[in-house]
Amino acid sequence: MHIYILGSAAGGGCPQWNCNCPNCHGVRTGTINAKVRTQSSIAISENGVDWILLNASPDIRQQLFDFKAAQPARKLRDTGITNVILMDSQLDHTTGLLTLREGCPMNVWCTEMVYQDLTTGFPVFNMLKHWNGGLQYHQVDPKQAFIIDGFENLEFLPLIIQSAAPPYSPHRHDPHEGDNIALIIKDHKTQKQLFYAPGLGKIDDQIMQIMQDSDCVMIDGTLWTDDEMQQTGVGKKTGREMGHLYISGEGGSLSYLNQLSTPKKVLIHINNTNPILNEDSAQFAELKANGVEVAFDGMQIEL
C-alpha cells in the first residue's frame, strides 16, 4: 500500500491566510522551524499509478500539482484519481470536490448522513449534477467493509467514531451514526493495515485494539491542549466541543499512543495553533521522544 500525505493541517492550513498566531506568523516570515501545510487529505494506491483520495481538501489543486504521481499523462486529459472517500462532510474535507469537477464523472464514497449534508446544507452533489456526469454517489455502510473496483487488494472497513457533524449540518447538535467515520484499510497483498482517523473525539477499548493490530495509525492531531483555541485567543470552543481529542496530558491521545507497539504512529489534521508544528518546540521533541511522527505535506509511507 502506497500512502501519500497531500495535506496535513486542519482547516485553514498553516499559515492560514488571515491568521497571525505564532505559528502562522512564524511560517509566513520564516522565523520558526516549521513547514507550510495545506488542509488535510491523503491518497492511497496499491500499484502507485491508480489512486484513491481520502477527503477532498480546498487546497486540492495545489496538492495534486505537487503530487506528480497523480498525473500519469497517458492521454490529453488524464488523472490517476477516479475515486474519493469522504470521512465526514466538513468543509475542509469536501470543498475540493468543486475543484475536481473537470474530472467528472467522479466516484464519491460516503455514508448516507454525509450524503444528506452534501445534498442540503452544502449541496455539492446537486451543483455538479450536470457537469459531465457529476459526482457518482456510492453509499458506505458504516458497519460493513467495501472494495472499490480496480483496487481489489484493498479492503476498506469503516468504523463509526465519536466526533461532530459540521456547523452547517442540520444535525450538528443531533449526532447520527455515519456523521464521522474512521477507516481500517487492509492490503491483502502485503497483509498490512492502516488505521486512518483524522477526526477523532474519543479513544475507547475497540479503537485501542484496532490501533494495536495496525501497522500504521494516522490519527487526529488537531490540538495539543483541549483549551488551545481559547488560550491562543483565536476561538472560544474547546477541542472536545469541536469533536477533536487533544494530544497532551491525562486522557490525551499521546497517552494512548504510548501504550501501543504499533510500528508507525502519525498525527495528522494539525491546527495552526498547535505548538508541535514548530520543530524546535518542546512539544515536538516530546512526540519524537515517544516515537510519534508529525505528518507533513508530501510525506510518503509504504505498507
Curated annotation (Swiss-Prot):
This is Coenzyme PQQ synthesis protein B. InterPro entries: Metallo-B-lactamas, PQQ_synth_PqqB, RibonucZ/Hydroxyglut_hydro. SUPFAM superfamilies: Metallo-hydrolase/oxidoreductase. GO terms for biological process: pyrroloquinoline quinone biosynthetic process. Pfam families: Lactamase_B_2. May be involved in the transport of PQQ or its precursor to the periplasm. It comes from the Bacteria. The gene is pqqB. Belongs to the PqqB family. Pathway: Cofactor biosynthesis; pyrroloquinoline quinone biosynthesis. HAMAP family: PQQ_syn_PqqB (MF_00653). Keywords: PQQ biosynthesis, Transport. It comes from Acinetobacter baumannii (strain SDF).
